[in-house]
């Protein structure tokens, strides 16, 4: 029974780290990347629609994104949504496609982005710790119901802590890599 709890815990912690990775992909690091626009939603016929559902996003060169809307009438709304996002990028349109030149990051902007990365890292660590708390509560419940012994509880709790340490270390490694990528000129 405690093995089942450990497996569920590992799975949930893995999902938390994957969600953190997706979150970091939206942080701009000076290079064009279609995932920068993943969080951008457009008011499309009255509904907030993810940009990647109403347009194709391509990366023709290292510092350029091209957005080709499937519906040309949405160009104005797409431009507004990108400007409102906190990405610090300005779209230009020729009526058919929207081009976004990704400017080189200033030192100040790099430091802001590092703070954002650290905030996301802390949120991911909190998520992992919440999974640990839930697992420990579940194990205590099993012990209280007599399904596992006190020794099994102690052993399983230690295993959960090892998993927590492992996933927190993964988050730290990913954070350091992203910070290095951002601070690279």
Curated annotation (Swiss-Prot):
Location of the protein in the cell: Cytoplasm
Organism: Bacillus pumilus (strain SAFR-032)
Gene3D superfamilies: 3.30.1360.40, Ribosome-recycling factor
Function of the protein: Responsible for the release of ribosomes from messenger RNA at the termination of protein biosynthesis. May increase the efficiency of translation by recycling ribosomes from one round of translation to another.
GO annotation, cellular component aspect: cytoplasm
Keywords: Cytoplasm, Protein biosynthesis
Signal peptide: none
NCBIfam families xref list: frr
One Pfam family named in its UniProt record: RRF
GO biological process, one term: translational termination
Presence of the UniProt keyword Metal-binding in the record: no
GO molecular function terms attached to this record: ribosomal large subunit binding
Keyword match Protein biosynthesis: yes
The protein, known as: Ribosome-recycling factor
Family note: Belongs to the RRF family.
Source domain of life: Bacteria
């Amino acid at each position: 029974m405690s093995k089942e709890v450990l497996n569920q815990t590992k799975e949930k912690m893995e999902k938390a780290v994957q969600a953190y990775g997706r979150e970091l992909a939206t942080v701009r690091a000076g290079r064009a990347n279609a995932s920068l626009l993943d969080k951008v939603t457009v008011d499309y016929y009255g509904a907030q629609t993810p940009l990647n559902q109403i347009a194709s996003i391509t990366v023709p060169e290292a510092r350029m994104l091209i957005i080709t809307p499937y519906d040309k009438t949405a160009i104005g709304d797409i431009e507004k949504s990108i400007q409102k996002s906190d990405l610090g990028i300005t779209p230009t349109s020729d009526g058919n496609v929207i081009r976004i030149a990704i400017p080189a990051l200033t030192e100040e902007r790099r430091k802001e982005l590092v703070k954002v990365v650290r905030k996301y890292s802390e949120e991911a660590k909190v998520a992992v710790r919440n999974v640990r708390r839930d697992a420990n509560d579940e194990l205590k419940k099993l012990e209280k119901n007599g399904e596992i012994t006190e020794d099994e509880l102690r052993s399983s709790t230690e295993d959960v802590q090892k998993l927590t340490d492992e996933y927190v270390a993964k988050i730290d490694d990913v954070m350091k890599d992203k910070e290095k990528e951002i601070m690279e000129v």
